[in-house]
């Protein structure tokens, strides 16, 4: 959770317990070599954005889990080495990679098995007021 303090619990205590997610960031992940090879590694056509998400979804589709471990602390300076997507070329690449991901993984994006269906998809952890109960 971006900018969370060490003493925060997170929604439903998720910052304190191991939890499965459809995808985690590759800024810090570990996976057995044989599973990495079985999955086919990172999709190198996704140059910057989403290669980790694509990988994690393929891991999930093979029946494995992407587990967040709260006891691991990491500080990651997003875009520190490559810079921000502020040029028109970088932004165009980002849009193309976003489209690729949505086209390929629409089923997971629209029906994430680890996201509470009562939450809105338009904001973080907000109840969807338009959903029938």
Feature map (PLM): residue ranges:
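Catalytic donor-sugar/metal-binding loop of nucleotide-sugar-dependent glycosyltransferases
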Residues: 36-37, 44-47, 53-75
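Generic secretory/membrane-interface signal
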Residues: 30-31, 37, 43-46, 91, ...
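A recurrent flexible, glycine/aromatic-enriched loop bordering the glycosyltransferase active site
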Residues: 1-34, 38
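Generic hydrophobic alpha-helical scaffold/packing signal
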Residues: 28, 56-57, 102
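Active-site-adjacent helix/loop segment of glycosyltransferases
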Residues: 60-132
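Short Gly/charged-rich anion-binding patches and loops
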Residues: 31, 54, 96
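Short, contiguous acidic/charged loop-to-helix segments that flank catalytic cores in large enzymes
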Residues: 18-26, 42-51, 87-90
């Amino acid at each position: 959770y971006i900018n969370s303090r060490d003493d925060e619990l997170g929604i439903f205590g998720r910052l304190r317990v191991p939890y499965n997610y459809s995808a985690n960031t590759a800024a810090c992940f570990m996976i057995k070599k044989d599973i990495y090879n079985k999955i086919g590694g990172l999709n190198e056509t996704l140059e910057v954005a989403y290669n980790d998400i694509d990988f994690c979804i393929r891991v999930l589709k093979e029946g494995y889990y992407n587990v967040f471990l709260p006891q691991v602390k990491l500080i990651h300076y997003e875009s520190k080495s490559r810079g921000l997507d502020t040029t028109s070329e970088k932004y165009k690449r980002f849009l193309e990679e976003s489209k690729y991901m949505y086209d390929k993984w629409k089923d997971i994006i629209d029906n994430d098995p680890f996201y509470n269906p009562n939450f809105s998809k338009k904001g973080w952890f907000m109840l969807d007021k338009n959903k029938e109960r």
